[in-house]
Structures are given as structure tokens and as C-alpha cells.
């Protein structure tokens, strides 16, 4: 049984191939196109996965997409109606791509797949759609080494959910509760990413990396004005300070006044203020995540926790969960963002749609995340032929040679 999972059309497009329940191959489209966070149809990633397993598209039994576009469109419409007439410009900007493409995503996917395989749309395998947060949860739990675990998914937004809790048992994921848009820890962090001059859905790691250089001067301000955090970790944002629900920017003038100036321009010089802001939102994020983990443990009483969603890429917060949290161990999906949704979509089809049993081997199913293309020595030798500025250097002790190059202060070769 061969199942192809696809994540696409938002950011970090990817494909994953499950063969008889095993993750046989997975890759992000950006690795092939060299376009950072490539959001297009992952044709190259799909082709790689099929080639890696010696399969054609006609050998695939099911194709599963990682979210449900029509439910997402429902959220967009309800949000615009709730805030109307505010957000009209954003509505006008968003509608053409939905009316032209995204509302017909099922047909668009079939068209792209059929064109790639050189077959008719009628000859394609069944196309399924999985809920966004369930794809995240499945990528975390079904790939983990645990037979039973709590699952916490935190991201910007899927269809409606921004935070969700699941109980994983064997081959089942049981939904517990969720927080919905616009109240989102991921979007709160992205708002500060935007405000400090970095790119949303790309530069969040820079904010995390900037945080140690600052002081948490704005923590109380954030908690007092921007977000109401309950003791159990659940929260609500004060949308008076944000623009992402209906606007073309993440924050507004009221937010700027709160922090003493307009949002930084991209590539502008980072000042101590931005460092302090980064430290402050990082501290707030960590405290919320820890509270949520304590609540999840109290409610579900499991020894283990699985994490996914873009917020689970915050390794500093993850470290605190491991050190200070109530769980014996945690497991984080390495591709915790939307790319990993391709894996989760395919695994959901295998375990829940097809009801296949799940065998626990004591280790995870990610093969050390070595699921993408691998290169032979002969293949590597061919690169200098195409790129004249590269030189090949062969050595029996790669580590010793790398240390030598680093000490010398230059690259290899010679």
C-alpha cells in the first residue's frame, strides 16, 4: 500500500511517501527549486519520493492533502464579515486567488498531478483531505516511539485551530480541545517578528536567536495589553493591537505606540530595543507553553508528550519543556511546520482511514530525518564539472580535514 502526502500552497510545500506504513521518503520543494519556503505545487518533491521508491503515480493507492481549503475559506469569510467594513482592502486582495484557484484546489491538484504523470485525471488514485492540525498531530504522534502520548500542536492557524490537544493511543488520535483564530500564539510571535523587521513565517528563528541579547523589559506590558493568559495556559489576544485578521500587516499604529515607534523596516540595523522586545516575547511564549504542558499532563495523565506545529520549532521553549515540564520524555516532529503536514496527512490515511495496526519498535519512524535525496561519492565528484569555482578534495578523515580548514580560516580544496 502506497500513500502520498502533500503539503502546498501556503508555505514550505512538501511531499512524503508512506509504503506499507513506513515513511519511505520525504522532501521539501525548496530543496529542489532553491526558493526559500517555496509554496508552489511540490512537483520536484513528489517526483523524488516516487523515484526513491521506484514507483510511478499509478502505483499510488491514496493521495492525501494536509488541510481542508473550503473550511479555511469559511474562516476567511466569517472573519471579514465579523470585522466589516474594516479589512475591505485585505478582502479585495485575498479574494481573487481564492475565487480563481484555491476554491478549486481539488481540481487544481488533480490537474498538476495528472500533468506530471502524463495520465488523465480520471486515472489518478483517490484524493483525500485531512484537517490541518490533525496532520500536525499525526506527524508528531504516529512517527513517535510512544504507544500512548499527549499531543500538543501550536502554530499560526490551520483552518480555524491555532492550538490543539490530542490523546494518541495506538493507531488513534482523539481530539481533546482547541483554541481558535484569531487567538494564536504563533501569530503573536509572528507579529513581533514583523515588528522587529524580520519576515513572517521565515524570521521567527531570528527573534528567538536575538532574545538572549536582550532584557525582558516588556513582559509585563505584553501580558497587560496584548494577551490575557489564564493559569491553565489558555489565552486570548487583544485584537485592538493587531492587524493580521483583516489587514495587510501584522500590527497596527496602536501596537507601534505601545512599543515606542513604527515597525522596523526589513534589513534595518537591530538596536537594543529590538533585542529587549525579542527577549520579552520569548519569555512570554515559554511561560505559555509550559503552562499548557502542565494542563495537558494534568488532564490526560500520560508520561509522554509529542509536539508539532510551527511553535514547536522554538527549541529554547522545547528545552524548558524537557527540563521543567511534567512529562518523562517528549518527542518533537523534526519537520514541525507545514512541511511535516505531508507526513502527517499520509500517516493519518494509513492508521485512521485504513485502520492499520501500529507497531512500536522503541524508536521513532523518521530514520534520523534522513528522508530526502542522498548523494554518492561519484555524484559529488560531478559537481565541480558543472561549477568551475568548486574543487574536489578527497580525504580518508573528513573530520580532521574540516578542523584543519577551520583553523586555517578558509575553505577546502588544494
Where do the protein language model's features map onto the residues?
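Short acidic/glycine-rich loops and adjacent helix/strand connectors
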Residues: 1-391
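Short stretches within intrinsically disordered, low-complexity N-terminal or propeptide regions
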Residues: 18, 394, 398, 402-404
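Conserved small/polar residues in nucleotide/adenosyl-binding loops
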Residues: 388-395, 412-414
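Hydrophobic alpha-helical segments, chiefly the membrane-spanning helices
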Residues: 400-414
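Acidic-residue sensor for enzyme active/binding pockets
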Residues: 286, 394, 407
